[in-house]
A protein has these predicted regions:
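A short secondary-structure junction motif
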Residues: 25, 29-32, 71, 120-123, ...
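Alpha-helical bundle segments that constitute or directly flank the non-heme di-iron/ferroxidase center
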Residues: 4-32, 55-58, 66, 145-148
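Short, low-complexity, intrinsically disordered N-terminal peptides in bacterial proteins
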Residues: 1-9, 175-178
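Short, contiguous alpha-helical
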Residues: 35-85, 114, 126-178
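Solvent-exposed interaction patches of small proteins and small membrane subunits
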Residues: 10-11, 37, 101
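Acidic/histidine-rich alpha-helical segments that form the ligand environment
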Residues: 14-19, 23-25, 81-126, 146
Length: 178
């Protein structure tokens, strides 16, 4: 039983599993529902995918690669960049893109990320940099937040599907919450 931090091979397996879950769900979901917005201002599934793609590049694998390339030990002053997620989402305009292409883009990035994570050493986990909003982030911190982040957005995608099904449930709505 793991009671402490998740080791890199476990994180790599969880990252792979998240990608497989996303692929399975989006493959089954009809294309028109990829662009369904459950409420004004909420992301459609394609926008969630775009966010995951950008997070892979800018937030997780990207930051880990920067930290490793710098050889930065935690607290040495390596500055990590923040990014405006809403502005990036608007600029990407993923709602207008093909959902299958977004899934494939994420899958390719994720395969490289899984290899990166699987190859991390114990010494790599304590390396880090300083984020402008949250302060010190180590590779270990990023790995655990990555697992959490994936599941949060998988839940968001699944909730979008639930939101699309809800109005068509008739009396069965009484069995559950919207």
């Amino acid at each position: 039983m793991i009671t402490g931090p998740l080791p890199p091979p476990v994180v790599a397996a969880l990252l792979h599993a998240a990608s497989a879950t996303i692929h399975a769900e989006l493959s089954a979901l009809p294309a028109p529902l990829h662009a369904f917005h459950p409420a004004p201002g909420e992301w459609c599934v394609k926008e969630v995918l775009g966010h995951l793609i950008e997070s892979e590049q800018r937030g997780f694998a990207g930051r880990i690669r920067i930290i490793l390339a710098a050889g930065a030990r935690a607290g040495e002053g390596l500055a990590l960049e923040g990014w405006d997620q809403d502005a990036v989402a608007r600029a990407r305009n993923d709602c207008a893109r093909d959902g299958a292409a977004l899934v494939e883009e994420l899958a390719q990035l994720r395969a490289a990320s899984v290899s990166l994570v699987a190859g991390l050493t114990p010494a790599d986990l304590s390396r880090g940099g300083r984020h402008p909003k949250v302060g010190l982030l180590t590779v270990a911190d990023l790995l655990h937040e990555w697992v959490h982040h994936d599941r949060n957005h998988i839940r968001q995608m699944l909730a979008n599907v639930q939101g699309a099904a809800w109005p068509h449930m008739g009396a069965a709505q009484r069995f559950s919450l919207p």
